[in-house]
């Protein structure tokens, strides 16, 4: 988060170090953090554009199937102690041909970044931001006209992917 104020409040779920530290402090094996990620990503993918509490509930139900070897209480503790998203979707713009979608994502400190989903016949390509602003100064790019404000942390980058996943799944329903 170079150049930015430290994050406050509940930690972001997609911060791998915080999540692993949390599960180990609660007496779980560190691998539980990876399993939590898997069930939450699955819940996001399967649920589409649902509210965060519904994603946590679905993730909790996935513990029951036994394949994840994840204690249900681990999901409950994570849902109480982490924000699923510290960022939020501020704006969505669809291209006329509906093959490209730009998402404006507002970070917890109020800064905004852009992510883009480009749909092709056999795949979807995603472009995510790793910084707020840019030092290059390219006049054709909105981000390039801003000064470099700071770097995103890993969880903010991963949240962009998760928010795009959530949006694309809801869009395809």
Task: Kindly give the residue locations of the regions a language model identified.
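Flexible, acidic/Gly-rich N-terminal and inter-domain linker regions that tether
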Residues: 1-124
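Conserved Radical SAM active-site core
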Residues: 58, 113-173
């Amino acid at each position: 988060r170079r150049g930015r104020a430290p994050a406050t409040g509940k930690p972001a779920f997609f911060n791998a170090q915080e999540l692993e530290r949390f599960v180990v402090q609660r007496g779980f094996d560190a691998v539980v953090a990876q399993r939590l990620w898997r069930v939450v990503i699955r819940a996001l993918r399967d649920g589409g554009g649902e509210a965060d509490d519904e994603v946590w509930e679905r993730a909790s139900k996935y513990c029951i199937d036994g394949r994840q070897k994840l204690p249900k209480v681990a999901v409950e503790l994570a849902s109480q102690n982490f924000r699923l998203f510290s960022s939020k979707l501020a704006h969505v713009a669809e291209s006329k041909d509906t093959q490209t979608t730009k998402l404006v994502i507002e970070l917890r400190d109020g800064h905004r970044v852009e992510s883009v989903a480009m749909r092709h016949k056999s795949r979807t390509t995603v472009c995510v931001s790793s910084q707020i602003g840019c030092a290059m100064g390219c006049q054709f790019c909105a981000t390039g006209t801003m000064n470099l404000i700071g770097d995103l942390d890993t969880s903010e980058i991963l949240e962009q992917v998760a928010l795009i996943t959530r949006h694309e799944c809801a869009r395809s329903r």
